[in-house]
UniProtKB/Swiss-Prot annotation:
Its EC number is 2.1.1.4. Homodimer. Keywords: Lipid metabolism, Melatonin biosynthesis, Methyltransferase, S-adenosyl-L-methionine, Transferase. Expressed in the pineal gland (at protein level). Not detectable in retina, nor in liver. One of its GO terms (molecular function) is acetylserotonin O-methyltransferase activity. This is Acetylserotonin O-methyltransferase. Substrate binds at residues 256, 302, 306. GO terms for biological process: lipid metabolic process; melatonin biosynthetic process; methylation. Coiled coil: none annotated. It comes from Bos taurus.
Amino acid sequence: MCSQEGEGYSLLKEYANGFMVSQVLFAACELGVFELLAEALEPLDSAAVSSHLGSSPQGTELLLNTCVSLKLLQADVRGGKAVYANTELASTYLVRGSPRSQRDMLLYAGRTAYVCWRHLAEAVREGRNQYLKAFGIPSEELFSAIYRSEDERLQFMQGLQDVWRLEGATVLAAFDLSPFPLICDLGGGSGALAKACVSLYPGCRAIVFDIPGVVQIAKRHFSASEDERISFHEGDFFKDALPEADLYILARVLHDWTDAKCSHLLQRVYRACRTGGGILVIESLLDTDGRGPLTTLLYSLNMLVQTEGRERTPAEYRALLGPAGFRDVRCRRTGGTYDAVLARK
């Protein structure tokens, strides 16, 4: 009977089971499956994995076999037993320490974003984030959930560092930024984008501006603080004086906030910006009609359940930047996750 239902029914099941796939990925990362197999001298059977992880034999075997089906692990038979090893995909993106690892961002997604997504229907009804239901944190305290402990803050910062390690150079090369000798990355976190900037544009210097707790962690844990071309400045970009610069980068910042708060921040940036300078907004752009790409629409729903903001179309960014005083607004799609919007003072 199922085979007679056609592609529509199969697609529906694929959508409905999508959360299970995500949880397999999150759980395997949380348990340390990929690290264990990366460190092992040879492929391990499920009993050995279970013993090392302190997990149940039955659950471990089920998880490992599901990861094989998802092409995260590969299985061979030795001595009558199945043994498991990481695939290239897992070795590249899911093992801590890999130059291209995305493990920390996946852990954040599983521990924080996924919990909020359980309340998507309520978010749609109410039009606000779901931190109160998910974590008992008032909805206006946006980053209290993400930064609810120093470990969570460090993990989120590491996750963003990993994202920018893969995607930073592409989006920073969307426009030639060499005419801007001093660049200020507002909400710059670990300094990953600043590091990419001075690597791509060696004649530039960069300032990383973020709240004190983030700056202190960045200096302790991330290598950008060791580059003499990069400095750190503590402050709240909504309240405190902004360092003077030729170019301000707002990467994954405006999508957190309402239009009113974005306008307020952009006006502050315009006043601080040197004459002839500019602003680079890095976000995932919606299509002109607002009905795609799918990934950006999902990100926008993520903003609904977690922040005050949303993803926007190029026209909507122009409508924010123009009244703040910026001119010559140009939008460029990179073909990657994040796109670039450059405007001048």
